């Protein structure tokens, strides 16, 4: 009886039963999470693109030539380093930046570091608008994370992508070179801190005790010598 009632609980209800409402809430939460993830990836791509678009291409109508050159100089001065999100090994940098692919959440680089290994097994691309492209999968040499793929063969209309490395935004992180303000202090220029001060004061106290002991020994010797001289 209970099973029959639960299977028909949604029928004839004007406000909707609890199981239906719960299912709708779960679907809504899942959709919101996916939209949030897609939005964050999109923002990351736009950030990388905006930081380095000034180094290539023409300036927009509202920008002056001076502003464009200044932005390009800043970009070249502080390039982005792309790291593996799994083990943080450097994979490449923005000096080899070509463009991004917003539809696939990928960035295209001309070259990558030795930390990127290439699987020589070739596969046909199943992506839209990439019919005829032959790809080779990219892996991190440190943690074997799947990073993306490299275009080995392309049809004539996609020749611009040939031999370019396509890194997935989900598999990489970025670091602005020179952004760290903290400097490493060498051993010969170590900062004077409370711990070193305590050690120095302890050493000085030990030296003071040694000097006092030597002073007492010297005083005893002088006393004996003066006593022996008075007897003679």
Swiss-Prot record:
Coiled coil: none annotated. Keywords: Cell cycle, Cell division, Centromere, Chromosome, Isopeptide bond, Metal-binding, Mitosis, Nucleus, Phosphoprotein, Ubl conjugation, Zinc. The modification Phosphoserine is found at residues 36, 39-40, 232. GO terms for molecular function: identical protein binding; metal ion binding; protein-macromolecule adaptor activity. Zn(2+) binds at residues 84, 87, 140, 143. There is a cross-link at residue 161 (Glycyl lysine isopeptide (Lys-Gly) (interchain with G-Cter in SUMO2)). Residues 79-177 form the Mis18 domain. It is found in: Nucleus; Chromosome; Chromosome, Centromere. PROSITE patterns: MIS18. GO terms for cellular component: CENP-A recruiting complex; chromatin; chromosome, centromeric region; cytosol; nucleoplasm. GO terms for biological process: cell division; CENP-A containing chromatin assembly; chromosome segregation; pericentric heterochromatin organization; protein localization to chromosome, centromeric region. Pfam families: Yippee-Mis18. InterPro entries: Mis18 (IPR034752), Yippee/Mis18/Cereblon (IPR004910). Required for recruitment of CENPA to centromeres and normal chromosome segregation during mitosis. PANTHER family: NEUROGENIC PROTEIN MASTERMIND, PROTEIN MIS18-ALPHA. Belongs to the mis18 family. Homodimer, and heterodimer with OIP5/MIS18B. Identified in a complex containing MIS18A, OIP5/MIS18B, MIS18BP1, RBBP7 and RBBP4. This is Protein Mis18-alpha. It comes from Otolemur garnettii.
């Amino acid at each position: 009886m209970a099973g029959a009632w639960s299977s028909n609980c949604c029928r004839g209800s004007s406000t909707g039963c609890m199981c239906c409402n719960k299912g709708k809430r779960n679907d809504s939460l899942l959709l919101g999470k996916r939209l949030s993830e897609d939005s964050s990836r999109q923002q990351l791509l736009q950030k990388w693109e905006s930081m380095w678009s000034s180094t290539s291409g023409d300036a927009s109508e509202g920008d002056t030539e001076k502003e464009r050159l200044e932005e390009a100089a800043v970009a070249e001065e502080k390039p982005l380093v792309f790291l593996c999100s799994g083990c943080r090994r450097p994979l490449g940098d923005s000096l080899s930046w070509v463009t991004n692919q917003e539809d696939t959440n990928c960035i295209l680089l001309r070259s990558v570091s030795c930390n990127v290994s290439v699987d020589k097994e070739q596969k046909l691309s199943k992506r839209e608008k990439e019919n005829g492209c032959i790809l080779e999968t990219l892996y991190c040499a440190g943690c074997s994370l799947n990073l993306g793929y490299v275009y080995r063969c392309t049809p004539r209309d996609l020749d611009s992508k040939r031999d370019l490395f396509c890194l997935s935004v989900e598999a990489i992180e970025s670091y602005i070179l020179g952004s760290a303000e903290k400097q490493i202090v060498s051993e010969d220029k170590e900062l004077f801190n409370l711990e070193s001060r305590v050690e120095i004061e302890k050493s000085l106290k030990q030296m003071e005790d040694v000097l006092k002991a030597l002073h007492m020994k010297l005083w005893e010797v002088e006393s004996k010598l003066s006593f022996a001289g008075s007897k003679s």
